[in-house]
Amino acid sequence: MDEIAFGLEMADHPFIWVVRSKTWAPPDGWTKRVKEEGLVVYDWVEQRSILAHPSIGGFLSHCGWNSVMESLANGVPLLTWPMLDISEQALNAKLVTMGLGAGIVVPQRDVGGEKITTIDRGVICERMKELMGGAKGRKVKERAQELGRLAWHAVEKGGSRKKLDELIERLTNKNM
């Protein structure tokens, strides 16, 4: 957690960090140093509301399905960092980055192919800066925004939502 904290500080970009750990405490002086650019929340938050806010420019995610869907539906690109190789997280991360082009990978393996168990602050800083201002970041942001527009269009009147409403109407009338 300290490495994430230092990486966020080094990136020198505004952030909201939701910390669910009951035992982690920020490094000495860190909170004071980032108070102008960072907000740390030590409690549950409604992720959808945060991702829907227009000032959110990216989302560092473990790539659980709900997190991916909420982020992309709101047009927010992802820094993908799956925690578990044996879950859907790794597959979702590949879908977001390689399939959809709406995210940037936080490396999971070192040069020798070994699983990275502790992330380095420099990696967090570098990937955050790339997402928020680099050429690749601009590209994945455009793609995420396009996917967000498509998602909202699908549920607008006349989109896929209309067909779903018609199906529900038919099923409801048939059962009455």
Tell me what each language-model feature is.
Residues M1-M176:
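Catalytic core of nucleotide-sugar-dependent glycosyltransferases
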